[in-house]
A protein has these predicted regions:
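An N-terminal-biased, well-structured beta-alpha scaffold segment characteristic
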Residues: 1-86, 90
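Glycine-rich phosphate/diphosphate-binding loop of Rossmann-like nucleotide-binding domains
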Residues: 1-23, 133-193
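Conserved active-site and cofactor/substrate-binding residues in soluble primary-metabolism enzymes
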Residues: 23, 42, 66, 78, ...
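Short secondary-structure transition/capping segments
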Residues: 23-26, 48-50, 106-110, 186-188
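Short, hinge-like loop/turn segments at secondary-structure boundaries
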Residues: 28-32, 112-115, 190-193
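Glycine/serine-rich phosphate-binding loop and adjoining beta1-alpha1 elements at the start
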Residues: 55-149
Length: 193
């Protein structure tokens, strides 16, 4: 309904688009969207995607792109310039969100911070699952198990998230970053530099 109030006549969401993130099709319908096929979604004048063409210039979705279409999402144009080139060759306009500067003014469009935050969190959970011991120190009748020791290299958004998650799981955390200014952020999360 909010988009309809802005004059956007119709919002089509590809069936299953939000399933991996825990958003069923009904959640989009409840907000006024229509559920459709990939063809229905790509028929729009404005297409948004988390990963445009899955960063693959050979994606079958490329055949659905048409001249004048505007595509907004993450396309990795610096790492995979062939995707941007393929879209340009089709006459489409690409707004690659990972190139939006991280400024206060553009903060509402900052997709990298949220993605990096999740990546740091998930990295620790995957490491905790693979580690043959538990993260926190445990004292049992059989003895005491020392806490896991975690080294986080890099204290950007993902690194800070990894530090915070490791600490919450009970690990002893050390971090390294090339910026001296990161020292205070790392220490505020309870890690050593």
């Amino acid at each position: 309904p909010a988009l309809l109030k802005l004059g956007i006549a119709k919002v089509v969401v590809q069936s299953g688009a939000g399933e991996a993130a825990g958003f069923p099709d009904d959640a989009y319908v409840d907000k006024g969207a229509t559920i459709g096929s990939a063809d229905d979604a790509w028929a729009a004048d404005l297409v948004t995607a988390v990963r445009v063409l899955d960063a693959d210039p050979q994606s079958p979705d490329l055949a659905r792109v048409r001249p004048g279409q505007v595509i907004v999402g993450m396309a990795a144009p610096l790492a995979a310039p062939e995707v941007a080139g393929a879209l340009a060759a089709k006459g489409a306009t690409l707004y690659s969100l990972e190139l939006v500067p991280r400024t206060t003014r553009a903060q509402a469009m900052d997709v990298l911070s949220s993605q990096a935050n999740i990546a740091g969190y998930q990295a620790v959970l995957l490491a905790a699952e693979a580690l043959p011991k538990v993260f926190p120190m445990l004292t049992t009748s059989a003895g005491t198990m020392s806490p896991a020791r975690v080294l986080v290299i890099g204290a950007g958004v993902a690194g800070l998230s990894a530090i915070a998650t490791s600490r919450r799981l009970g690990a002893v955390v050390e971090a390294y970053h090339v910026r001296d200014a990161a020292k205070e952020e790392v220490q505020s999360l309870g890690a050593r530099v």
